[in-house]
Amino acid sequence: MFRIVSEYLGLSEVKDIYLEAKSIEEFEERIGHLKGDIWLSCTTPIKHLIPKYLQLEISEDINSINQITRIKGDWKGVNTDGLGFLAACRHIGIEPTYSTLRLRGGGSTARSIAEAWAADGGKIILETGRREITRGPWDKAIIDSEDATIAIDLDTGPGGGESIKMNAEIQVSISYDEDTDYNQFAVIMVAAQHLEAWKELYAPHRKEDLPSLSLLLKELAITK
């Protein structure tokens, strides 16, 4: 995905890497061997540990960073879960501003999505799960209703598992693997998150030059 966008922008000398680290100590050891500018997508547990380690300012309501860059020695980070979810919803024809989200889960992904959804003017129905969402800037958007436009279960069991059936016009999932089609919501959201990271971190000065989400998904399907 990074290679597709970088080639679209005319950038060269791009190399894909995979860095596995289950602790900050492992991250520090592996990152120390890498030279040049770096862009990493972070997952659990690193996305919760990296802000303090790199001394990055983050939203205390979300408390995680899933995209980090090191450019000319300067580290920056952002959480793109919320903005990526909104962009993916718009791609499938749902406008968050005028829609109601039924949300189950209380982890950082759920909080990021709730924050972005509320900030965009949408309404939220909370579904009871294993982990309840904390109080936050999304409180003003929470309503008591049975009618939801879109639903997502972010509270599946450890190691994955089936989502519960939720009452909404459409229910989406952000779980995917190498066999997931590129027209599935999970892949659409990942691609949207990637573009948001380009806008926020890697090339904010070239926002207008970035490919559209539709074009990126088309290129991903071709190169699969």
PLM regions: where:
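A short, well-structured beta->alpha microelement
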Residues: 17-27, 128-147
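Glycine-rich adenosine-cofactor-binding loop
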Residues: 79-82, 89-122, 126-130
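A short helix->loop->beta-strand "cap" motif at the edges of active sites that frequently abuts
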Residues: 70-71, 122, 166-170
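Structural motif
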Residues: 20-22, 42-45, 105-107, 127-130, ...
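Adenosine-phosphate binding glycine-rich loop
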Residues: 170-224
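Phosphate/diphosphate ligand-binding glycine-rich loop within oxidoreductases
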Residues: 1-92, 178
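Rossmann-like adenosine-cofactor binding region
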Residues: 136-191
